């Protein structure tokens, strides 16, 4: 299976290519006009692998939650590439992708509590368990104030020990007592296309959707609609 993965949910821009068990990726700080930056990464990955866009099985993307502008742009780029090549899309939770980073050898965690700064005094959070080495949602993704998250997360942590991932633990001092309950803490973890590609390959084409359903998941309601495909910029995706 060949899957291209894209992510713009945080301050980073990343792309990855899963090709029959081999994973290659590109990561960089997101620059102004990062839709074009993402397309350059895609071109580089396809060139390195000797693969044409049309030869892929699907395009995966980080569907959120995360930075609103980045989510919209990632969905728009995904749609444009998928329509151009006649490919389906596979949406992957960015919180799940963060949990996956701590479920990967050499020291894989069995359970991960993800807490990502959502700004405006709130966090995105969810609990995940490892099943056959892949992150599976164990509590519903939510956006909440730190105090509300603590009340709900403590009961989940009582079941078994867990690791913690995400910027929320560092952004809100109120979460320090919760962080102290964790076996280990990785506040610097951000979503990456590598884990999105891995999880999409695990989920398979049964999770694939038509390109028009490449839509962000914000967990907040006060967000503008996805931009038109013209957000790709004047050049758009290269012909394949």
Language-model features: locations:
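N-terminal beta-alpha supersecondary unit
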Residues: 1-65
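Patatin-like phospholipase
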Residues: 8-28, 173, 184, 200, ...
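Residues at secondary-structure transition points
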Residues: 29-37, 68, 72, 76, ...
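Surface "functional belts" at beta-alpha junctions
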Residues: 33, 88-191, 218, 223, ...
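Phosphate-handling active-site elements
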Residues: 47-54, 82-92, 107-110
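DPxDG-like acidic metal-binding loop motif
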Residues: 60-94
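Acyltransferase
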Residues: 184-240
């Amino acid at each position: 299976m060949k899957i291209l993965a894209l992510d713009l949910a945080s301050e980073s821009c990343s792309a990855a290519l899963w090709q029959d068990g081999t994973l290659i990726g590109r990561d960089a700080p997101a620059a102004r006009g990062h839709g074009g930056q993402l397309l350059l990464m895609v071109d580089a990955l396809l060139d390195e692998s000797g693969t044409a866009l049309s030869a892929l099985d699907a395009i995966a993307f980080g569907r959120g939650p995360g930075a609103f502008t980045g989510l919209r742009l990632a969905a728009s780029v995904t749609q444009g590439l998928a329509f151009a090549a006649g490919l389906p899309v596979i949406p992957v939770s960015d919180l799940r992708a963060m949990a996956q980073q701590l479920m990967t050898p050499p020291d894989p965690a069995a359970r991960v509590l993800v807490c990502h700064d959502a700004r405006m005094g709130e966090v995105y959070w969810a609990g995940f368990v490892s099943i056959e080495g892949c992150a599976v949602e164990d509590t519903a993704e939510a956006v909440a104030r730190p105090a509300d998250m603590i009340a709900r997360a403590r009961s989940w942590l009582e079941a078994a020990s867990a690791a913690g991932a995400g910027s929320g633990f560092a952004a809100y001092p109120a979460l320090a007592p919760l962080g102290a309950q964790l076996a280990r803490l990785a506040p610097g973890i951000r979503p990456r296309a590598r884990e999105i590609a891995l999880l999409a390959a695990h989920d398979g084409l049964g999770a694939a959707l038509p390109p028009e359903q490449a839509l962000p998941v914000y967990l907040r309601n006060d967000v503008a609609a996805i931009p038109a495909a013209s957000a790709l910029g004047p050049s758009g995706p290269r012909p394949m």
